[in-house]
Every structure is written in C-alpha cells, then in structure tokens.
C-alpha cells in the first residue's frame, strides 16, 4: 500500500518531534533518532510510543 507523501511531510515522531521515514516493506513509519518503528494499521499511522517497536 502506498503512503501519502504529503502526510509524511507533516507527521513527526511523538517522542522527539523529528522526521519519520516510511518503510514500505514493513508498513511502518520509522524514527532513526529514537530507533522506533510506528505501525500503520489499515492505512492509519499509529503514532503512540507504547505501540512502537524498536528498530534493529
């Protein structure tokens, strides 16, 4: 599923307020600074720290 690039320009990491990157294969929004992956569920980003997974 494609992710809206315009939305990607305005969303931010809820932890550090930094830029997020879309991982098409994993269907996540990733914060490289905090090393967290936020899931995208049914096309909706879930930007909750307690739902994020650590990036390896």
From Swiss-Prot:
InterPro entries: Trm112-like (IPR005651). GO terms for cellular component: cytosol. It comes from the Bacteria. Pfam families: Trm112p. SUPFAM superfamilies: Trm112p-like. PANTHER family: PROTEIN PREY, MITOCHONDRIAL, ZGC:162634. Belongs to the UPF0434 family. This is UPF0434 protein Sden_2197. It comes from Shewanella denitrificans (strain OS217 / ATCC BAA-1090 / DSM 15013). The lineage of its organism: Bacteria, Pseudomonadati, Pseudomonadota, Gammaproteobacteria, Alteromonadales.
